[in-house]
Design a protein with these regions (language model features):
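Secondary-structure boundary/capping signal
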Residues: 26-27, 31, 55, 122-123
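C-terminal helix-rich "cap/oligomerization" subdomain common to oxidoreductases
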Residues: 52, 116-159
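NAD(P)-dinucleotide binding in Rossmann-like oxidoreductases
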Residues: 34-44, 51-112, 125, 157
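A general structural signal for well-ordered alpha-helical segments in protein cores
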Residues: 15-16, 108-115, 136-139
């Protein structure tokens, strides 16, 4: 009741935002299933996504897992990147050859940037509002899909 919308909204929204940021494009269609366990909000949700240029993605948000676990896998033409609980690995062959990858150093500090944007109307917002809007559009489309038993739902583009 106090969650603000369930696990997909609370935790999954951050992952959805990251996935769209990594892909560099929005999701256009979604299919989702959720389990509420007799509560008002989703506890576990499985989401299938189709990106604007045809790429596919999946997301599982598990609110009743015995421990925290976070994993993102991106498969491409020259291998895959696996982010697992804070570590990034590049897997380079089907045999599993891999090496740890250092995260790129950035000068961006989202909190400092947010404060600067409040103080200075001419400051550049490095996290534009459209990122949040796309995440909300996708989250709400996933909720509609789950309510319809997993029916494929088009993700609206309001901006």
């Amino acid at each position: 009741k106090l969650s603000g919308g369930g696990q997909l909204n609370d935790s999954g929204s951050h992952l959805l935002d990251i996935i769209m940021w990594i892909a560099g494009e929005p999701v256009v269609e979604v299919s989702a299933f959720s389990d509420h366990f007799d509560t008002e909000v989703d506890i576990n949700t499985a989401v299938k996504m189709k990106f604007q240029r045809g790429g596919l993605g999946t997301l599982s948000v598990v609110g009743d897992a015995p421990r925290w676990w976070e994993e993102i896998m991106i498969v491409g033409s020259v291998g895959q990147l696996l982010y697992r609980n804070g570590e990034l690995t590049h897997i380079t062959s089907i045999e599993g050859a891999s090496y740890q990858v250092a995260f790129p150093q950035t000068s961006a500090n989202p909190v400092a940037n947010f404060i600067e944007c409040i103080r200075n109307p001419k400051a550049v917002n490095h996290t534009p509002a459209v990122c949040g809007l796309r995440t909300i559009e996708l989250t709400e489309a996933a909720w509609r899909s789950a309510a319809a038993g997993g029916k494929v739902v088009k993700v609206p583009r309001t901006a």
